[in-house]
Amino acid sequence: MTDDRSTDERRTADRDFEVDLDDVLDDEDDDEGLFDDLLSGEPIFENKEVLRPSYTPHELPHRNDQINNMATILVAALRGETPSNILIYGKTGTGKTASAKFVSQELEKTSKKYDVPCEVEYINCEVTDTQYRVLAQLANTFIDQNRAFVDARIADLSDLRAQADDDPNALEIGGSPGDDRTGNESSEGSDVSDSFSDLRERFDSVAEIDDRIDSLEADKAEMEQVPMTGWPTDRVYATFFDAVDYVERVAVIMLDEIDKLVEKSGDDTLYNLSRMNSELDNSRVSIIGISNDLKFTDFLDPRVKSSLGEEEIVFPPYDANQLRDILQHRSDVAFKADALSDDVLPLCAAFAAQEHGDARRALDLLRTAGELAERDQAENVTEDHVRRAQDKIELDRVVEVVRTLPTQSKLVLYAILLLEDNGVHNVNTGEVYNIYKTLCDELDADVLTQRRVTDLISELDMLGIVNAVVVSKGRYGRTKEISLSVPVEETEAVLEADSRLSDIEDITPFVQARFENN
């Protein structure tokens, strides 16, 4: 009996446990997690990615003339000829890069259609900003393509060899790509150029096929990737040269922000790239340079300037109506139906038109407004979201500009901020200089002359961080009255995030120094 009761008790306990477990699971289902509430709202975006700068649209409103001009120049590549080099100018957000990428995609698509070996390699010179890095990136790209080509060629030859083992007459038909070294599609589906598939070579024996395979494998073994540092530049260039010339191709090299490369590394890269065609045997190279600075060629060697700037295309700023058209095209894809109130696109276009017709700014503004609306779990994007987005973007811009200022400019700005933060407004250059000198002494930094500090204040004024106005003091002459144009709290946080400026603890003595020379 004792054992039976124990069994019954265990069964009852098991049933009780099952009920309790079910209750726990029900409670967990009812309990909303961190993201459940955020996901409960109706999404506003259909495809947010089309509003990002990295997206290349299928249509570029108001840029047909520039696109057709580029296509007219680059069509030479599809005839196996060397296209003229192109320099593209225009301010930020005028569609330069998007248009060039659009034309490049069309060029590569058409080259595949007609089996012409042509490819476009894009380099952002704001990131890849030295001759070594540019040449290394290009060399490694072409080395990868050449390895894929060799693998495809070896696979074809191996197939032919297998056929010859079964039937010696197979050698009479040919069946392998030949020594005219142009690419093919590899057995793995890797797209190397299709143009060599019609070129054949004849083999008299299986031994000749084996020799050809050995030769290709030796080629591949010599295709060494360039490390991102450590080699002499002339070795990097030689590796790039051999890689681009290994197969027959027209290579269009697109250098975005080309002025940043020249500014940091000089024009040696452009000199080498623009003059290498005279030494190439199999390939041809063309350059597309994209710049925000219409005057950057003034700093080039005359020989580089003449060969690089064979064709020039200028992208003018968009006006408000054109920006509205661009926003309409993108918003149709980016947002759910009826997600935007009627005044959103005109307001985004108007704000961006004030920023020299910057389409990138307009798209960024529209995307940010949509994100703010989603965070509010609003049903629509409204004018208020656009205005808040404008404030947020402007603050983000200021933070980034301040963060990247040179140390001396930060010290000058910090001196102005300390005065404003302690109730001293519309200060003059002398007052700022007194505080600046004290800060330099505190941090053991070099002290610039007052004339140089005045220049730094003018630079901060041009960046929109301070407002410096020349005012007349009558018989005392003229002076600059300086005030902050950015939020004090956010600016102070960015400056104090600098490891050197964060060492300053007590600001009171610095403000008091303002009165020492009065």
Swiss-Prot record:
UniProt keyword annotations, A-Z: ATP-binding, DNA replication, Nucleotide-binding
ATP-binding found in the keyword field: yes
Transmembrane segments: none
Residues at which ATP binds: T94, G95, K96, T97, A98, Y318, R330
Example GO biological process: DNA replication
Record bears the keyword Secreted: no
InterPro entries membership: AAA+_ATPase (IPR003593), AAA_16 (IPR041664), Cdc6_C (IPR015163), Cdc6_lid (IPR055237), ORC1/CDC6 (IPR050311), Orc1/Cdc6_arc (IPR014277), P-loop_NTPase (IPR027417), WH-like_DNA-bd_sf (IPR036388)
Protein family per UniProt: Belongs to the CDC6/cdc18 family.
Role this protein plays: Involved in regulation of DNA replication. Required to initiate DNA replication of the circular chromosome at a nearby autonomously replicating sequence (ARS) oriC1.
The name this protein goes by in its record: ORC1-type DNA replication protein 7
Organism: Halobacterium salinarum (strain ATCC 700922 / JCM 11081 / NRC-1) (Halobacterium halobium)
